[in-house]
Amino acid sequence: MKYGIVLFPSKKLQDLANSYRKRYDPSYSLIPPHLTLRASFECAEEKADQLVSHLRNIAKESHPLVLKMTKYSSFAPVNNVIYIKAEPTEELKTLNEKLYTGVLAGEQEYNFVPHVTVGQNLSDDEHSDVLGQLKMQEVSHEEIVDRFHLLYQLENGSWTVYETFLLGRGE
């Protein structure tokens, strides 16, 4: 089964992201706006209990964190993804690193760049045009996030919550 680990931001930030995702993100209908803490991975269903136990322990030893969104940016020229950048705080980086330990041990494919995607799979021209417009807009959003979510992918490609973990409590 394919899993992923994410933070879901507040409705206010999700609404902002969705105002662009509706038009510029083909994954709009498959998953709500989110910040990926650990890239998707495969795990046998019979190991799900081990996975959940490990994530509970990580949540228990972690604390709620500040999510501060600072600007629009892009992964171009590597790929044409436009996103709202989150400040990479120590707490966020530490949580990301913990999600590559124990039963989740493995190498990260990319450096951790905390963000919420607003557009992807854009042509070069569309990417340049949309990013140019967004960079003229100011982003100043801050919130406290007190949970992360283990998601799994359904057969139709959409993602749904398997379990939610409260930071500082492990529940």
Swiss-Prot record:
Motif (HXTX 2): 115-118
This protein's name: Putative phosphoesterase YjcG
Active site positions: H34 (proton donor), H115 (proton acceptor)
Matches recorded under HAMAP family: 2H_phosphoesterase_YjcG
GO MF annotations in UniProt: hydrolase activity, acting on ester bonds
Pfam families attached to this UniProt entry: 2_5_RNA_ligase2 (PF13563)
Record InterPro entries: 2H_phosphoesterase_YjcG-like, Cyclic_Pdiesterase, YjcG
E.C. code: 3.1.-.-
Enzyme class: hydrolase
Keyword Zinc-finger: no
SUPFAM superfamilies per record: LigT-like
Taxonomic lineage of the native organism: Bacteria, Bacillati, Bacillota, Bacilli, Bacillales
NCBIfam families, A to Z: PRK13679.1
Keyword annotations: Hydrolase
Gene3D superfamilies (UniProt xref): Cyclic phosphodiesterase
Assembly notes: Homodimer.
Chain positions of motif HXTX 1: 34-37
The family this protein is said to belong to: Belongs to the 2H phosphoesterase superfamily. YjcG family.
